[in-house]
UniProtKB/Swiss-Prot annotation:
<dbReference type="InterPro" id="IPR041355">
    <property type="entry name" value="Pre-SET_CXC"/>
</dbReference>
<dbReference type="GO" id="GO:0009738">
    <property type="term" value="P:abscisic acid-activated signaling pathway"/>
</dbReference>
<keyword id="KW-0808">Transferase</keyword>
<dbReference type="GO" id="GO:0140951">
    <property type="term" value="F:histone H3K27 trimethyltransferase activity"/>
</dbReference>
<feature type="compositionally biased region" description="Basic residues">
    <location>
        <begin position="846"/>
        <end position="856"/>
    </location>
</feature>
<dbReference type="GO" id="GO:0031519">
    <property type="term" value="C:PcG protein complex"/>
</dbReference>
<dbReference type="GO" id="GO:0009737">
    <property type="term" value="P:response to abscisic acid"/>
</dbReference>
<feature type="compositionally biased region" description="Basic and acidic residues">
    <location>
        <begin position="438"/>
        <end position="451"/>
    </location>
</feature>
<comment type="similarity">
    <text>Belongs to the class V-like SAM-binding methyltransferase superfamily. Histone-lysine methyltransferase family. EZ subfamily.</text>
</comment>
<feature type="binding site">
    <location>
        <position position="821"/>
    </location>
    <ligand>
        <name>S-adenosyl-L-methionine</name>
    </ligand>
</feature>
<keyword id="KW-0539">Nucleus</keyword>
<keyword id="KW-0678">Repressor</keyword>
<dbReference type="InterPro" id="IPR001005">
    <property type="entry name" value="SANT/Myb"/>
</dbReference>
<feature type="domain" description="CXC">
    <location>
        <begin position="594"/>
        <end position="693"/>
    </location>
</feature>
<feature type="region of interest" description="Disordered">
    <location>
        <begin position="366"/>
        <end position="473"/>
    </location>
</feature>
<keyword id="KW-0938">Abscisic acid signaling pathway</keyword>
<feature type="short sequence motif" description="Nuclear localization signal">
    <location>
        <begin position="838"/>
        <end position="845"/>
    </location>
</feature>
């Protein structure tokens, strides 16, 4: 009995648990239905309120526009009430006269008789219809086709010429499949899905309830919920990242700060978001950097009041400097002095001991005592500092220097720039001066034995002083006028500031002025950069025989022997020792390229893609695999065997096949060719000086030296291109620009162009075709002719293939331009076919074949 009772009690308990679960599920479903009804009423109420708010806002806008007219109408009604009749309404009801036409000779008179006039018909002269014209966008350079402009896999539509009927032209195998319309959820529906999903989850019961409420499939609801969940996650991450402070970005390095800009910047066109090469390009770092821009320190002027060159102002020692130690306590009003000459000078002057000063290299500079800044003339020479025998010689020496304008006791920082802390530290005593002087002399002797340049010890921490003369002393001493606290060097350098500094050294060398002005503007001063450069002993990138910018005498920076020295550039090549290259006119390009050009074969050009080889190109180099030459945009070294080395042509020789560039179908590059140069002025604005009498004649496309082209009605077919000014034979007329599309895309577009009896397709290379139908320039309207006066030629310009139009003969002004479209035997229209007797073989013509049938 006990067992039976226990079993029965267990069954009763299980039934009770099942009943509780069922009640909870029912309560949950009932709560879900109530929640859905509540959300529905809430969203509907919000929608009604938003509609009312929009309606009220629109009503106010309408009132603002209508109020002037309403006030004018009310004023007119007031005038009618006062007895003034409405003349407009009265004239409409009772006109003065009714006219059916004008009599001869009375068209200009105001009053016309009321009798009817019989109108005469006028026959207009017959005017010929203008040719059909399609809208197009002007391009001054080629562009890659946008992804959404492709016709592959899309239904193409064209208009029949005669009837104007709209027809569909698509391949049967590429008929677009009908896409199911995707459900667009409203803002209210998104709110319901998101809130219910967050509160109740996305179980089957919840999905069924949402399906009944929104009349949407469960799969669409689940997909939409996942999209909303992903958006919420992204918004949360963006919100957490948006709360940064201003200083956090400075804690990142330059590479992290420019991470998003590296791929957006085109290093071939020097623009962001390049439409020719794409906005996301692989970053290729050249193995050899360009030499930094250099100038001598003696040729520069201080860039600001915080410039380190201010510390190099001339310091002339007055008579009171020698007796400063003994009279400092008596003259409390005398200004404190920092040290300007060697610590041996004041001690020797006070004791009357003769002192031999070492010979140093100084520059001949003109001194302006009013400003305290050296006016440097750039005249450099070596002068011997005279022997100082007594302290009384100092004033006489100072007067002599003013007459000769050449400072013999002038101090110059030879290998480093002292910090302001050292220059301002002027109150230190002369304790230990003798020891310091001994150490300095020993270091000078050691430097002589090693062969290093002797550092100028006239300014250091504990043994020299700069003296401020008495007012009205007349000694003409030059000092630094302002040593403000703001000019003190900053000790903290953020990572991005350090990276910017290193990049500045790479570009400008050890030029603190240019680094601070161009890369650290607002972050560091010129003096900060100079002190950081000295304290950290940063070695200059790409050391060579280039003189150190901090050395006044043009000596090279010591310690360069162990560094890797890259090949010297043309700028720093020694005179009389020009580097000789194994070079011939037929070995500049790749052998296969030269054979193809020399053989006159009309083969397609190869698309160039820069290689990322680190040093020398091997068998796996993309350029070698693609049978193209390495260019200046590649990462390989300049000594690469596959590198195109340009030409060495003399003046006016680059327009013949003797020029390697011209023979290879290339334009000369001023960065590669030896004697080809580009100048934009006379040098007054700091541009590169001229290197010869005339510019190279094989850079027309690069410099955009095109002729003026006019658009007009052609006598042959449709529209035509006309020349404004007369040109000689082989003159460059302009560039044929358009969209860069693939060959597969060109085949699909060509079917539409064939039906419309027009084509603007031009084969460019093995990967791209130019299409000027939608985008291009006015040369797209140049028509085909069996006897053309122009010819098209594909040229390789700055790493890209471009189509140039050149004069085949002398062309007079206002003459229409024609060139051969290179039609096939049965492709040319009737008007464009050659006469039967003309069977001239023109297979050796160097310009490429265009996919054209007729230009309108």
């Amino acid at each position: 009995m006990v067992t039976d009772d226990s079993n029965s009690s267990g069954r009763i308990k299980s039934h009770v648990d099942d009943d509780d679960d069922g009640e909870e599920e029912e309560d949950r479903l009932e709560g879900l239905e109530n929640r859905l009804s509540e959300l529905k009423r809430k969203i509907q109420g919000e929608r009604v309120r938003s509609i009312k708010e929009k309606f009220e806002a629109n009503r106010k806008k309408v009132d603002a526009h209508v109020s002037p007219f309403s006030s004018a109408a009310s004023s007119r009604a007031t005038a009618e009430d006062n007895g003034n009749s409405n003349m407009l309404s009265s004239r409409m009801r009772m006109p003065l006269c009714k006219l059916n036409g004008f009599s001869h000779g009375v068209g200009d008179r105001d009053y016309v008789p009321t009798k009817d006039v019989i109108s005469a018909s006028v026959k207009l002269p017959i005017a010929e219809r203008i040719p059909p014209y399609t809208t197009w966008i002007f391009l001054d350079r080629n562009q890659r086709m946008a992804e959404d402009q492709s016709v592959v896999g899309r239904r193409q539509i064209y208009y029949e010429q005669h009837g104007g009927e709209t027809l569909i032209c698509s391949d049967s195998e590429e008929e677009p499949e009908p896409e199911e319309e995707k459900r667009e959820f409203s803002e209210g529906e998104d709110s319901i899905i998101w809130l219910i999903g967050q509160e109740y989850g996305m179980g089957e019961e919840v999905q069924d309830a949402l399906c009944q409420l929104l009349s949407v499939d469960a799969s669409d609801i689940l997909e939409r919920y996942n999209e909303l969940k992903l958006k919420d996650k992204q918004n949360t991450e963006e919100f957490s990242n948006s709360g940064f402070k201003l200083g956090i970005s400075l804690e990142k390095g330059l590479g992290a700060a420019l991470d998003s800009f590296d791929n957006l910047f085109c290093r071939r066109c020097l623009v962001f978001d390049c439409r020719l090469h794409g906005c996301s390009q692989p970053l290729i770092s050249a193995s050899e950097k360009q030499p930094y821009w250099s100038d001598y320190e003696g040729d520069r002027k201080p860039c600001s009041k915080h410039c380190y060159l201010q510390l190099k102002a001339v310091r002339e020692v007055p008579e009171t400097c020698s007796n400063f130690a003994s009279k400092a306590e008596e003259k409390a009003s005398e200004e404190e002095c920092s040290k300007a000459v060697s610590s041996d000078v004041p001690h020797a002057a006070a004791s009357g001991v003769s002192l031999q000063v070492e010979k140093t290299d100084i520059g001949i500079k003109n001194v302006d005592s009013s400003s305290g800044v050296e006016q440097e003339h750039g005249i450099r020479g070596k002068r011997e500092v005279p022997i100082l025998k007594d302290s009384n010689d100092l004033p006489n020496l100072s007067n002599k220097k003013q007459k000769t304008a050449a400072s013999d006791t002038k101090m110059s920082f030879v290998n480093s720039v002292p910090s302001l802390d050292q220059a301002l530290d002027s109150t230190k005593g002369d304790q230990g001066g003798t020891t310091d002087n001994k150490v300095n002399r020993d270091s000078e002797a050691d430097a002589k034995e090693v062969g290093e340049p002797i550092p100028d010890n006239s300014v250091h921490d504990g043994g020299s002083s700069i003296c401020q003369p008495h007012h009205g002393s007349g000694n003409g001493a030059i000092i630094i006028a302002e040593m403000s606290e703001t000019s003190r060097p900053s000790t903290e350098w953020n990572p991005i500031e350090k990276d910017l500094y290193l990049k500045g050294v790479e570009i400008f060398g050890r030029n603190s002025c240019l680094i601070a002005r161009n890369l650290l503007s607002g972050l560091k001063t010129c003096l900060d950069v100079s002190n950081y450069m000295r304290e950290n002993e940063v070695s200059v990138f790409r050391r060579s025989s280039t003189p150190n910018l901090l050395l006044d005498d043009g000596r090279t920076d010591p310690g360069n022997d162990n560094d890797e020295v890259p090949p010297r550039t043309r700028l720093f090549r020694r005179k009389g020792k020009t580097r000789k290259l194994k070079y011939s006119t037929k070995s500049a390009g790749h052998p296969s390229v030269w054979k193809r050009i020399a053989g006159g074969k009309n083969q397609s050009c190869k698309q160039y893609t820069p290689c990322g080889c680190l040093s020398m190109c091997g068998k796996d180099c993309p350029c070698l695999t693609n049978e193209t030459c390495c260019e200046k945009y590649c990462g390989c070294s300049k000594s690469c065997k596959n590198r195109f080395r340009g030409c060495h042509c003399a003046k006016s020789q680059c327009r013949s096949r003797q020029c390697p560039c011209f023979a290879a179908g290339r334009e000369c590059d001023p960065d590669v060719c030896r004697n080809c140069w580009v100048s934009c002025g006379d040098g007054s604005l700091g541009e590169a000086p001229r290197r010869g009498e005339g510019q190279c004649g094989n850079m027309r496309l690069l410099l955009r030296q095109q002729q003026r082209i006019l658009l007009g009605k052609s006598d042959v077919a449709g529209w035509g291109a006309f020349l404004k000014n007369s040109v000689s034979k082989n003159e460059y007329l302009g560039e044929y620009t358009g969209e860069l599309i693939s060959h597969h895309e060109a085949d699909k577009r060509g079917k539409i162009y064939d039906r419309a009896n027009s084509s603007f397709l031009f084969d460019l290379n093995d990967q791209y075709v130019l299409d000027a139908q939608r985008k291009g320039d006015k040369l797209k309207f140049a028509n085909h002719s069996a006897k053309p006066n122009c010819y098209a030629k594909v040229m390789f310009v700055a790493g890209d293939h471009r189509v140039g139009i050149f004069a085949n003969e002398r062309i007079e002004a206002s003459e229409e331009l024609f060139y051969d479209y290179r039609y096939g035997p049965d492709q040319a229209p009737v008007w464009a076919r050659k006469p039967e007797g003309s069977k001239k073989d023109d297979s050796a013509i160097t310009h490429r074949r265009a996919r054209k049938h007729q230009s309108h």
